[in-house]
Amino acid sequence: MEDLETRCASLRTEIAAAEAQLTKLKRELHEAEGAALRAQSQKTASANATTGQRTKSKWPLHGEEYRRYGRQMIVPQFGLQGQLKLRDAKVLIVGAGGLGCPAALYLAGAGVGTIGLVDGDTVEASNLHRQVLHRSRNVGKLKVDSAIEYLRELNPHPTYIAHQAHLTPREAPDIFKDYDLILDCTDNPATRYLISDTAVLLGKPLVSASALRTEGQLMVLNNPPQPPGDKTGGPCYRCVFPKPPPANSVTSCADGGILGPVVGTMGVLQASEAIKVLTSAGESVEATPPSLLIFSAYSSPQFRTIKLRSRRPNCAVCSAEATVTLESVRSGSMDYVFFCGTVDPADILSPEERISPSEYGNVDSAGAQRHIIDVREKVQFDICSLENSINIPMSTILASAYSAPTLDADEPKRLPSWLPPEVAHESNKPIYVVCRQGNDSQTVVRKLKELGLDHGGERPVVDIKGGFRSWREQVDPDWPDY
């Protein structure tokens, strides 16, 4: 029996080695074919430059290109002319994450001639479930480098340009000017306004998308890309959202979560819209009114479309009364961070109202009587929780209407519906509050004190600093890092 198991293990090892070698050979073949194609093009160009003559090819594409792109070229709405337009196109993708990865993947596969990627982040393990260009071995590598490595293996023909930094107002105009179309694949309002403003001022159409949890949105903006003041141009991001959302209402994927197929769907739709814009260049787009596409994975139907108005007559960027200029963008006088606002980490409690995770770990080890309240949402509480902790989600606390509890023994007890009676009445037990990162828990500590649960300071109501992120660092290294 042991001999058979050993033989099976040996065969699996040999098969894995053979598959790895085959993959390596296929990659080398693709690279060699791409190099040969580029060398032939350079040789022809050099010969033409030397003789002063232009050699006319029988066909507008190389043979390998017909084989690679043939299935999309026989689509009636696309055809040979569509392929030629893609080959000559230059697309800039801002953000090499959940949206940018699938968008870049399909645009590279379709044969877009030049693809630029802008991102200053590095690959993290938490990216891999949705950012499909990055692989486990590239954790820690710059995202643009990781993405281009994958794209070159997929299709060596396009030119790939890496912009290895976050987009800034000073650099944005100089980067954008060399491209025909911009894709906004970012996840924060300040960058979205910067991208839209720069695209409008440089006359570039923009495909913008977003995704969070199980929902996504998509818009094609500044299409057609007419100068500011021209009412026939497509609306910009400011036309749709003249004012940014309150900074404290903006939820990131890290905080709100995201399903990989949801953001993947939106990225693929961005690529589809980009191809439509690029292949219709020079043609009228009046027949396609601006709209907002909304995707909801758990709804039926999953897709809805909302018609958008044309350019706002008082838009700060694309109207005749525009106040935002390329110079104001470059110089920084248009402060996007100030315009959108920022949320600083919560620091609303005094040092006496907070303890470190390691200090609470000592309390836990000593077996002291206490209440530990976990204010994460239930879905997070179900992933991991401390023994004997009570889950009271922050959203439940904020959404509930209540009157302050009466703790006087001579009056009937009136408690908030979300507060367990034992927490209110077991005044001999201190209350410890914890959350994911140490911000929500501070708010809840303040709320519990407003309700009088600290009995005028006689009963400790304490926040655990840094939440479970710090708990993992200081107490339990095996705590799930999600």
From Swiss-Prot:
Major place of residence: cytoplasm
Record's compositionally biased regions (Polar residues): 39-54
Effect ascribed to mutating C185Y: In cnxF472; impairs molybdopterin biosynthesis
Listed result of changing G100S: In cnxF1285; impairs molybdopterin biosynthesis
Recorded GO MF terms: ATP binding; metal ion binding; molybdopterin-synthase adenylyltransferase activity; molybdopterin-synthase sulfurtransferase activity; nucleotidyltransferase activity; thiosulfate-cyanide sulfurtransferase activity; URM1 activating enzyme activity
Necessary cofactors: Zn(2+)
Residues annotated as the enzyme's active site: C253, C435
UniProt protein name: Adenylyltransferase and sulfurtransferase uba4
Taxonomic source organism: Emericella nidulans (strain FGSC A4 / ATCC 38163 / CBS 112.46 / NRRL 194 / M139)
